């Protein structure tokens, strides 16, 4: 079996990133401020932040299960000033978990109010 690594038609395009959350309201408030985007759809168990004109959007999905383990995937956000971005995210309800510098890149590992991990990244 061989794998074609050349350019071809994609299976699909990235439309949304979905995060499972327990507290939908606090996460909506946090992520709309962090991303600087408004909600484009909201229902009992879902809220979409951003729209079709600026993909990918972030879809928050309310689930009953608690966040107990490290995320297998996470969001990276590029920032101009890491310290300012960390302070702002913490002020909005986030938590700083770690700060790492490797290969000329520094990033802060963060968690949203529901424990979902993401990184604020400054490229040197």
What are these regions (language model features)?
Residues 13, 69-71, 102:
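Residue-level preference for beta-strand/loop junctions
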Residues 23-24, 75-114:
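Vicinal oxygen chelate
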Residues 1-29, 55, 73-75, 121-124:
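N-terminal beta-strand motif that seeds the catalytic metal site of vicinal oxygen chelate
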Residues 34-39, 92-96:
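Conserved acetyl-CoA-binding loop of GNAT-fold acetyltransferases
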Residues 37-71, 113, 117-123:
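Conserved short beta-strand elements that form part of the metal-binding/catalytic scaffold
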């Amino acid at each position: 079996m061989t794998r074609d690594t050349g350019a071809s038609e994609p299976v699909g395009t990235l439309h949304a990133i979905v995060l499972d959350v327990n507290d939908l309201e606090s996460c909506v408030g946090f992520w709309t401020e962090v991303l600087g985007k408004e909600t484009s759809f909201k229902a009992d168990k879902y809220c979409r932040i951003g729209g079709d004109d600026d993909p990918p959007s972030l879809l928050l999905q309310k689930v009953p299960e608690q966040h107990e383990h490290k995320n297998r995937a996470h969001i990276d956000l590029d920032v101009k000033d890491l310290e300012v971005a960390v302070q702002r995210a913490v002020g909005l309800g986030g938590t700083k978990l770690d700060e790492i510098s490797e290969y000329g890149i520094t990033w802060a590992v963060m968690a949203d109010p529901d424990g979902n991990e993401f990184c604020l990244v400054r490229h040197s």
